[in-house]
Amino acid sequence: MSPATAPVLISCGEPAGIGPEIAVAAWDALQGTIPLAWVGDPRHLPASTTFTAITHPRAVADVPTGSLPVLVHDFAAPSTPGHPDPANAQGVIDVIAACVAWVQEGAAAALCTAPIHKKALIDGADFKHPGHTEYLQALAGGRSRAVMMLASDALRVVPTTIHIALEDVPRVLTPALLRETITITHAALQRQFGIQAPRIVVAGLNPHAGEGGAMGLEEQDWIADVISALAASGMNLRGPLPADTMFHARAREGYDAAIAMYHDQALIPIKTLDFDRGVNVTLGLPFIRTSPDHGTAFDIAGKGIANPTSMIEAIKLAAHMAARHV
């Protein structure tokens, strides 16, 4: 199927979270504009949902208007909002794998993943991966490293290290890792965002980007060298820059994406600037994957108050990237 007709798949995520309800709300907002299919157990959808069960993504085109196409994957148990059931953990994992298989074979244009709850997956299925992104990388065969971008109209930002303790960042952060992160980001901005000459800024690790060695040595010992070498190859790069002055409005006008050194250095600014509209994008995979930039929100699941905006933006961005993907 071509990207124009192939659907974006929405994986169910943790069925006891807000994933099912925001997926339905997003489909309702976008139906008629982007072909979509939800993948999971229909018992986990809001009770009022009108849906049509299908067995292959190509059948989305045959589903009547006003009915959610559902690629049915039977789970072990029903779900109770706010209370994850360990019996359903393997089902969550298997749905992600099924979606990846369909996207990789070209039956679907892209994957938009609803939030998972890692502890529930560990408790119920001995999940071995630090997070969603790392599992997707494994499903892709580990051919390249998956890089997490957080994107909105206000900012695109990429953390070089992701789901590790802050005390481990200096050890895990290496010249090779930073070089690969910048290179993958640069390629994705060209291929999937249509930016032919991306402008990228790189944060320092330490306060004030080390302040000449007074507050840390990584910037002068090797971060600056990595940036200089890649700039010499033709990339438009600046850095290392103090992270505390990289994200104000005027600074953001000067770049297309920012590279951060660790998780919170990247996620705090985007969630402050555009909390409801942020999208998690996985770069470096052989397929397109986006996700809303929030978690399962067990405390409000099933109450009808979850905001679907980030899911809507994630689906729209997935479709946009699929149309540009080369």
From Swiss-Prot:
<feature type="binding site">
    <location>
        <position position="289"/>
    </location>
    <ligand>
        <name>substrate</name>
    </ligand>
</feature>
<dbReference type="InterPro" id="IPR037510">
    <property type="entry name" value="PdxA"/>
</dbReference>
<dbReference type="GO" id="GO:0051287">
    <property type="term" value="F:NAD binding"/>
</dbReference>
<feature type="binding site">
    <location>
        <position position="271"/>
    </location>
    <ligand>
        <name>substrate</name>
    </ligand>
</feature>
<dbReference type="GO" id="GO:0042823">
    <property type="term" value="P:pyridoxal phosphate biosynthetic process"/>
</dbReference>
<dbReference type="GO" id="GO:0050570">
    <property type="term" value="F:4-hydroxythreonine-4-phosphate dehydrogenase activity"/>
</dbReference>
<keyword id="KW-0521">NADP</keyword>
<keyword id="KW-0664">Pyridoxine biosynthesis</keyword>
<keyword id="KW-0862">Zinc</keyword>
<comment type="pathway">
    <text>Cofactor biosynthesis; pyridoxine 5'-phosphate biosynthesis; pyridoxine 5'-phosphate from D-erythrose 4-phosphate: step 4/5.</text>
</comment>
<feature type="binding site">
    <location>
        <position position="163"/>
    </location>
    <ligand>
        <name>a divalent metal cation</name>
    </ligand>
</feature>
<comment type="function">
    <text>Catalyzes the NAD(P)-dependent oxidation of 4-(phosphooxy)-L-threonine (HTP) into 2-amino-3-oxo-4-(phosphooxy)butyric acid which spontaneously decarboxylates to form 3-amino-2-oxopropyl phosphate (AHAP).</text>
</comment>
<comment type="subunit">
    <text>Homodimer.</text>
</comment>
<dbReference type="GO" id="GO:0005737">
    <property type="term" value="C:cytoplasm"/>
</dbReference>
<keyword id="KW-0963">Cytoplasm</keyword>
<keyword id="KW-0460">Magnesium</keyword>
<feature type="binding site">
    <location>
        <position position="263"/>
    </location>
    <ligand>
        <name>a divalent metal cation</name>
    </ligand>
</feature>
<protein>
    <recommendedName>
        <fullName>4-hydroxythreonine-4-phosphate dehydrogenase</fullName>
        <ecNumber>1.1.1.262</ecNumber>
    </recommendedName>
</protein>
<dbReference type="GO" id="GO:0050897">
    <property type="term" value="F:cobalt ion binding"/>
</dbReference>
<feature type="binding site">
    <location>
        <position position="280"/>
    </location>
    <ligand>
        <name>substrate</name>
    </ligand>
</feature>
<feature type="binding site">
    <location>
        <position position="133"/>
    </location>
    <ligand>
        <name>substrate</name>
    </ligand>
</feature>
<dbReference type="InterPro" id="IPR005255">
    <property type="entry name" value="PdxA_fam"/>
</dbReference>
<dbReference type="Pfam" id="PF04166">
    <property type="entry name" value="PdxA"/>
</dbReference>
<comment type="similarity">
    <text>Belongs to the PdxA family.</text>
</comment>
<dbReference type="GO" id="GO:0000287">
    <property type="term" value="F:magnesium ion binding"/>
</dbReference>
<feature type="binding site">
    <location>
        <position position="132"/>
    </location>
    <ligand>
        <name>substrate</name>
    </ligand>
</feature>
<keyword id="KW-0520">NAD</keyword>
<dbReference type="GO" id="GO:0008615">
    <property type="term" value="P:pyridoxine biosynthetic process"/>
</dbReference>
<feature type="binding site">
    <location>
        <position position="208"/>
    </location>
    <ligand>
        <name>a divalent metal cation</name>
    </ligand>
</feature>
<dbReference type="GO" id="GO:0008270">
    <property type="term" value="F:zinc ion binding"/>
</dbReference>
<keyword id="KW-0170">Cobalt</keyword>
<keyword id="KW-0479">Metal-binding</keyword>
<keyword id="KW-0560">Oxidoreductase</keyword>
